[in-house]
Regions:
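Short acidic-hydrophobic, aromatic-tinged amphipathic segments that line or gate anion-handling sites
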Residues: 47, 64-66, 143-147, 214-221
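Donor-nucleotide binding loops and adjacent catalytic segments primarily
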Residues: 96-155
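Active-site and donor-binding regions of nucleotide-sugar-utilizing enzymes
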Residues: 2-78, 87-101, 110-111, 124-126, ...
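A donor-sugar binding/catalytic signature common to diverse glycosyltransferases
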Residues: 147-194
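Short, hydrophobic alpha-helical segments
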Residues: 229, 233-237
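Residue-level signal for inorganic ion chemistry
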Residues: 45, 104, 225
Length: 241
């Protein structure tokens, strides 16, 4: 986290002749491409994705791909026995939960009017438990579980997740997924001007095409979430691939 702060440290250490390694390569392929100039302050860059090596090579920076840590857990996401479960992942930060969970709940309820499905929210942090519990207590088909997200995703037939690492987890679990993201207008304006891609989820950015449905800001409505859930499940095998 805080790469801008870390690069300032690299800069000071470089002046003292101390060699440094930066873990991990900033996502200059997704937003703020000008940050690539800061790579000159480090001696070695460690990357999560192979294609990031090219960005380092463009500024003559020696780099190595160490792989994304989630790949070490790939087997945790494997399971052929799917259940009538929708995995809801509203984000790992309190602001994300506040901004995204309610519309996710409403979207699931509209989709689940026949009550054939159960939604489960994996809890990342104990502190989030009470916030989530307060928001779902009146919804009988929605619950939470204090388990690794892989435990829910590998059983789910579809997922609704907040943009972030959760999208990679859903990809590993081969779960047809709708990505949503709602934030305040100021953050949205700033991010919109800094983003290089038309997409916000990592799988879509890497593929440069819509692997997962994305619903952002005003498009993240209960109606659209319900529609996407129906679409994902109606063509389950295709969306899974």
């Amino acid at each position: 986290d805080a790469p801008d702060f870390n690069f300032e440290i690299h800069k000071k250490l470089q002046k003292k002749g101390i060699k440094t390694v930066h873990v991990v390569c900033p996502s200059v392929w997704a937003w703020r491409p000008g940050r690539v100039k800061q790579f000159n302050y480090v001696d070695y860059m460690l990357c999560l994705f192979p294609f990031e090596l090219e960005y380092c090579a463009n500024v003559n920076k020696q780099a190595f791909c160490i792989g994304h840590p989630l790949m070490d857990k790939q087997k945790d996401f494997e399971n052929d026995d799917k259940e009538n479960i929708i995995c809801i992942m509203p984000g790992s930060r309190k602001a994300e939960i506040q901004n995204n969970l309610e519309v996710m709940i409403d979207g699931f309820n509209q989709f689940n009017f026949e009550e054939k499905y159960k939604a489960i929210i994996p809890i990342y942090k104990e502190d989030d438990k009470y916030l989530i519990q307060d928001k779902i207590q009146k919804h009988k088909n929605i619950t939470f579980a204090n388990v690794e997200s892989s435990e829910i995703l590998k059983k789910a037939k579809a997922a609704v997740v907040c943009s972030g690492t959760a999208t990679l987890e859903a990809l590993l679990a081969e779960v047809p997924t709708t990505v949503i993201y709602k934030t305040n207008w100021f953050n949205h304006l700033v991010l919109k001007n800094l983003m290089m891609s038309e997409f916000v989820s990592i799988p879509n950015i890497i593929a440069d095409e819509e692997i997962f449905f994305e619903l952002l800001q005003s498009n993240a409505t209960p109606e659209n979430i319900a529609h996407d859930l129906n679409s994902n499940l109606a063509d389950y095998e295709f969306r899974k691939e």
